[in-house]
From Swiss-Prot:
Naturally occurring in which organism (per UniProt): Cryptococcus neoformans var. neoformans serotype D (strain JEC21 / ATCC MYA-565)
Amino acid composition bias (Basic and acidic residues), ranges on this chain: 46-66
Protein name listed in UniProt: Mediator of RNA polymerase II transcription subunit 7
Residue ranges of the region described as Disordered: 1-21, 43-66
GO cellular component, one term: mediator complex
GO MF entries: transcription coregulator activity
Entry function: Component of the Mediator complex, a coactivator involved in the regulated transcription of nearly all RNA polymerase II-dependent genes. Mediator functions as a bridge to convey information from gene-specific regulatory proteins to the basal RNA polymerase II transcription machinery. Mediator is recruited to promoters by direct interactions with regulatory proteins and serves as a scaffold for the assembly of a functional preinitiation complex with RNA polymerase II and the general transcription factors.
UniProt entry tagged with the keyword Nucleus: yes
Length: 239
C-alpha cells in the first residue's frame, strides 16, 4: 500500500509511457449518463439520417422529442447541460478556423504556420529584410567565424583585473563576443527557417530525379532481358 503514493509521485521521465491527457477524467459513467439524460441522445453512437423515409420520420420525431425535453429543463439543468457539452462533445473546428489559433496541452498553435523573424523574437537586425536568406547566410557565417576567432584571442590574452571588468559591465572578457555569437546563431536559424520553401522544392526535385534514375535503371534491365530472350529465341529457331 505504501508503494502507491511513491509510484504516483514519479516524474514523467521515470515512467514507461507518458500519462494520458487530463481531459479523459471527464468521461465518467455518471457524466455520460447525465449527458444522455439531459440531451436525449447518445454520446458515442452517430445517428444515421436520410437513408429511408421511415428512418427520416423516426429521426424527426426523435428530434422533436429532444427539443421538447430541452425546453422543459430548468435553468440549473441548462447550465449543467452546457458544461457537459463543453467537456464531452467534439471541439468546434469552425471556431478554430475563425479564431486562427488553438490551444493543445498548454501550447498555442496557429492554423496558418508563421515563420518567425528576427524582429518578432527581439533579435538585433543583422539581416536586411530585402535580401534573400540564401544571400544573407554566408556573411552571417563569416561574421560568426570572425567573432569566434576574436573570442579565442581574447581568452588567450593576459587576464584583466576584476575592477576593470566590473567597470565595463562584464563578468568575463568574452561576454561581448559570446552575446554576439548568440545573436548571430539566432539570426542564422531565422534565415534558415525562411528557406523551408526552397528546401522543400529542392528535396522534391531530388526525389523526382532519384525516381527518374530508378526508372531508367529498370528500363535498361528490361531491355537487356528482352535482348537476352530474343537471342535465345533466335538460337532455338536456328536448330
Amino acid at each position: 500500500m505504501s508503494s502507491l503514493p511513491q509510484e504516483a509521485a514519479l516524474p514523467i521521465t521515470n515512467t514507461l509511457f507518458p500519462p494520458p491527457p487530463p481531459y479523459f477524467q471527464a468521461f465518467t459513467d455518471e457524466a455520460i449518463e447525465r449527458y444522455e439524460t439531459l440531451t436525449g441522445k447518445s454520446l458515442f453512437v452517430n445517428d444515421e439520417k436520410g437513408k429511408t423515409k421511415g428512418k427520416e420520420k423516426k429521426s424527426d420525431d426523435r428530434d422533436m422529442s429532444v427539443d421538447i425535453r430541452i425546453q422543459d429543463l430548468t435553468e440549473e439543468e441548462q447550465n449543467e447541460k452546457l458544461e457537459l457539452e463543453g467537456k464531452l462533445e467534439k471541439p468546434r473546428a469552425d471556431w478554430v478556423n475563425e479564431d486562427g489559433r488553438w490551444m493543445c496541452f498548454g501550447t498555442m498553435y496557429t492554423t496558418e504556420p508563421i515563420i518567425p523573424t528576427a524582429q518578432s523574437i527581439g533579435l538585433p537586425p543583422f539581416i536586411d529584410p530585402a535580401v534573400e536568406p540564401q544571400e544573407s547566410l554566408p556573411p552571417l557565417l563569416h561574421s560568426f567565424l570572425h567573432t569566434l576567432l576574436l573570442l579565442l584571442d581574447t581568452l588567450t590574452m593576459t587576464a584583466r583585473t576584476p575592477n576593470e571588468l566590473a567597470a565595463a559591465g562584464w563578468a568575463s572578457e568574452g561576454d561581448q563576443y559570446i552575446q554576439h555569437l548568440t545573436n548571430l546563431s539566432a539570426n542564422m536559424m531565422v534565415a534558415s527557417n525562411q528557406l523551408r520553401s526552397a528546401q522543400s522544392e529542392a528535396t522534391l526535385v531530388l526525389l523526382m530525379e532519384k525516381e527518374l534514375e530508378e526508372r531508367r535503371k529498370q528500363t535498361e534491365k528490361l531491355r537487356s532481358k528482352c535482348k537476352e530472350i530474343a537471342s535465345g529465341i533466335r538460337a532455338l529457331k536456328g536448330l
